[in-house]
Amino acid sequence: MENKNRLVLLDILRAIGVMLMIEGHTIDAVMSPIYKDGSSILFQFWTFFRGLTAPFFFFSAGFAFVIATVKDKGEVLTVPARAMKRRLRRIIVLLLIGYGLHMPLQMFYDPSAVPQSAWDIFFIADALQIISLSLLVILLIALFTKKKENLLKSYIIAASLSLIIAPLTEPIKWETYLPHLVYPYLTFRAGSFFTFFPFSGYLFAGAAFSAAALSFPANDRARLLSKNFKRASMVSLILFVLFFPIQLLFVSPYVDYWRALPAVNFLRFGLVTSIAALVGYLSLQVTRFPKILPAIGKSSLTIYVVHLMIVYGSPVNIGLAQLLPGGVHPIVAVLIAVVVMTLMFGMVYAIEVYRSRRRRLAAIIIGDVTK
C-alpha cells in the first residue's frame, strides 16, 4: 500500500500539471486580446495560477527521474547501467521533441529560405529543453554521489542556487559571449519561455525530495514525504515574505518580474509543495483513485506534444490559434479548453485500452508457444 500511495501522489501531481497546462495554453491561445486586461484582478489571478503549470511539471519530473534512476544498495547509491542508458535516451528524445516543435518547415527542402525570425523561434528554450538539460545535471550528480546525505545536499544546493541566482544571470549579455544555440537557455531576452535559471530549480527540488525518500522506511514513505512537503511549503512562503520587500528595494524590474525574481519563485514553490502535501495526506486516506490518473502520468509527454499541435499548430499543421486569429469570449475559451482536455483524456484512455489488449494478446501468443 505504501508504494502505491507514493506513486498515486506523483500521479495526481502530474494530472494537476496536465490539466493546468491544457487549460492555460488553450485559453491563452483562443481568448480575444481585448479580454486580456492587465488591470483586471480576475485576469491577474488566472495569469498567476497559470504560472504554476511549469513548476508542477518540473517538480514532478525531477522527483520521478530520481525515483526511477537511483537504486539504494544499503550505504551506497548506484545508477544501474541499463537505467542510465534509458535516462540518457529519454533526455535526448525530450531535447529533439522540444526543438522539433519549433522547427521551420522550410528547413526540410530549402534551408536558405528560412527567415531569421524563424531561426530565432527555433533556438528559443522551451519547457522540454529546460527539462532535458536539468535532468542531465540531475543524472550527473547521481552518478558521482554515492551517499544518500550527499545526494540530498547536492540537490538542495542546486535548487537553492537556481531559484536565487536568476537576478544575477539575467542582466548578463550572454548573446555577446555564447552561440545562438546556447544563450537562449540563460536569458528571457532571446524570447525563451523558460530559462535554466530559475526553472531548473523546480526539477532539482523534486530530485531533492526524491533523494530524501530513499532514506525513509518503505512502510512510512508517503506520510514522511507529505510531512516534508508541508515543511518545505512553510519555509518557502516565509522566504517569499522576507525576499519580496528586499528585492523591491534592491532588484530593478529589468525583465518579466513574474518569472525571474526569487520571491515569486519561492511563492510558487510554496504553493506547489502545499498542494503536494495535501495530495500526499489525501493519498493516505483514500484507498482507490481513478485509473486514468496513472495513465495521465505515463502519457504526459504525449499529451504535451499533441495538445500543443492542436492549440498552437506545428510545422505540419495549423492549430486553434491560427483558426481563431481574432480570439473568442472568455466563456467560449473555457468551453474550448474543456473540449481539448476531454480529447486528451480520451486519447489517453484509448492508448491504455490498446496497451492492455496488446499485453493480453502477447500473453496468449506466448502461452500457445510454450505449450
Which residues are covered by each model-predicted region?
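Alpha-helical transmembrane segments and their immediate juxtamembrane cytosolic regions
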Residues: 1-371
